[in-house]
Structures are given as C-alpha cells and as structure tokens.
Amino acid sequence: MKRDDLVSPECMDGDNVYETTLRPHSIKEYVGQKKIKKTLPIFVEAAQKRKEALDHVLLYGPPGLGKTTLALIIAREMGFNIKVTSGPVIERPGDLAAILTNLKDYDILFIDEIHRLPHSVEEILYPAMEDFYIDIVIGQGPSARSMKLDIPKFTLVGATTRAGLLTSPLRDRFGISFRLDYYAVEELTKIINRSASIMSIEIEHSGALEIAKRSRGTPRIANRLLKRVRDYAQVKGEGIIKRAVAVHALEMLEIDDRGFDQMDRSILLSIIENYGGGPVGIDTLCATVGEEKTTIEDVYEPYLIKEGYLQKTARGRIATKKAYEHFGKRKFEVGQKELF
C-alpha cells in the first residue's frame, strides 16, 4: 500500500482481509449512524412479523463509511442468506437473471456501486423489484419471443457513492433509503478501541483519540491507520499505542492533525499559490496536481468541502479562509488590501 493510499476511503488491496474480521455482526455492535440504528431495527422487525421480504434498501454516501457492513447486518438481522456483487461485474442482462433465479425467498441481494449498472441490466431490475418477475428473451431475430419468469421474493440492497447518478426509475423503487454521514471523532475512537481489542493491540485512550482525529471521519481509514501505528509502536513504542507514539507515527506517514496527506495539501496549495485562491477549473487543477478527475472528486473533495477548506462553485474550486489559515498564509488581491 502506498503512503498516499492510507487516507483514501476507497477499499485497497489488503483491506478486505482485516475488514472481514473487524466488521460488527449486529446493529447493536454497529457504532455511529444513529438515525439508521434507530429506524432499521423497526423495519426489520415489522417485515419479520408480516413474514415478508424487507423493502428494498438504498445506502448512499462517501466510501468507507460502512455500506457493505450494513448490508451484511441486514441479512443477519433478517436471518437469510446474502449474495454480494457489484455493478461493474454484472455486464449483461443474463448475468443478473442468473443471480436472481438462484436466490431463495427473502434472500438479500447486495449490489455495490449500483450506479454503474449498464442500462440494459437496470431495466431487468424494474419488474424484479416491483413484482418479482423478469422478462427473458428466447431465440433471436423475428422468431424471438419474450417469456415471463417468476423469481423469489427478495430484498435488494443497493450501495452507491454517487446517488445523483442513479436514474429516477431505479431510485424510486427503493422503499428504504439511508444516507451514511461522516463519523464524529468520539465514534471513531470507539471503533478504534474495538478494533484494537479484536487485533490484540494495547492502546491508550489518548492514542485512539489521536488516530481518530486524523481519520477523516471514516472507519476504513481509522482501521488502516491503526494497523500502521501498531507497526510503529511495536518497533519504537514498546508495543503500546500512546498519544506520543500515534503522533510520531502519523507525522512520519505525513498525515497531519487534520488528516490531510500529501495530495490534500497539494490540491489546496496549488489553488492558493498557483491560482490566487481560485476559482480554478477541475481539469486545470487535475493537470496541476497530476491526479485523475474522478479521484479528486470522489476521494479528496468531499472531505475538504465538508471540513470547510474548499468551495465547489460553477466557476471552479476556491480555497477558503480556513485553508489559508491552516497553511499559515494570508490572501491578497492585486490592487486591494489584505482580505483576511
């Protein structure tokens, strides 16, 4: 794993190994997302009492916040099997038809990155979600005919980081919709302490708190940083993660007290130093920092915007006063007095 990948909320190679171990197995163990924890058990219990499939569920929000974990918890709480797949994997209508026909009543079908489903595949989902049947075409050319095929009563759980890319017909078919928000530092501290216990890592509360502060509100990043700080503690800190050990480890990894890595700093400093604070177009910014547009938009911008360091406008990206203060800089405009 590259150093710059440490604070990426995207799932990296090697993440799945420890994420499977660290995931909570019930809604009671799940930390954060208070609204979901309050309402989801009600929907699950109501479906169980009616002996019906749970309404289709849409989970959306930034990556790394626990959408896959929630899908697995839904399956466990309902007491049925779950089939896990993703939008890019389902390339043809026949691929989806094969998955649907192999489900059993009340099973859970989890489709990650559901916004990336091909349109032809998405159309198969419409009758499947509403009336639990699919139309399959038999034969080719003039002799081809359509046949209605009933499928089990299932629950679709769709996850996406780009809810705006979902078509209205698909989005409207989800009876339950949850937005996952970034986690508070206190919630991340609980997650880190829980993960440390599972991984047999000795950690002080102050050490967990320091890691949480630099985890960008994202559990996936928190667990990833915990592993790297553990390595440092075993070599430099007698195996115990204290605050000083966490600070030194994260500074060595060039992750500052706001959770910024080299690319975060490069984005903000490029806007400040090269473009007078902005606005600057996204394509120009990408060329300046040497990063792909989708990576900037999906990985870096959401956190910078949420924390108030970056503004996204119709004219381009603008560094805020908070960004200037973070780097100890002051903004001037030609021919004008100091703004801040």
UniProtKB/Swiss-Prot annotation:
CC annotations in GO: cytoplasm; Holliday junction resolvase complex
Keyword presence, RNA-binding: no
A single GO BP: DNA repair
Stretch list, region Small ATPAse domain (RuvB-S): 184-254
Compartments it resides in: Cytoplasm
GO MF terms held by the record: ATP binding; ATP hydrolysis activity; four-way junction DNA binding; four-way junction helicase activity
Reactions the enzyme catalyzes: ATP + H2O = ADP + phosphate + H(+)
Keyword Secreted attributed: no
Primary residence: cytoplasm
Keywords, in A-Z order: ATP-binding, Cytoplasm, DNA damage, DNA recombination, DNA repair, DNA-binding, Hydrolase, Nucleotide-binding
Region of interest (Head domain (RuvB-H)), residue spans: 257-340
PANTHER family: HOLLIDAY JUNCTION BRANCH MIGRATION COMPLEX SUBUNIT RUVB, PTHR42848
Comment field on protein domains: Has 3 domains, the large (RuvB-L) and small ATPase (RuvB-S) domains and the C-terminal head (RuvB-H) domain. The head domain binds DNA, while the ATPase domains jointly bind ATP, ADP or are empty depending on the state of the subunit in the translocation cycle. During a single DNA translocation step the structure of each domain remains the same, but their relative positions change.
Main function: The RuvA-RuvB-RuvC complex processes Holliday junction (HJ) DNA during genetic recombination and DNA repair, while the RuvA-RuvB complex plays an important role in the rescue of blocked DNA replication forks via replication fork reversal (RFR). RuvA specifically binds to HJ cruciform DNA, conferring on it an open structure. The RuvB hexamer acts as an ATP-dependent pump, pulling dsDNA into and through the RuvAB complex. RuvB forms 2 homohexamers on either side of HJ DNA bound by 1 or 2 RuvA tetramers; 4 subunits per hexamer contact DNA at a time.
UniProt similarity note: Belongs to the RuvB family.
Entry protein name: Holliday junction branch migration complex subunit RuvB
Gene of this entry: ruvB
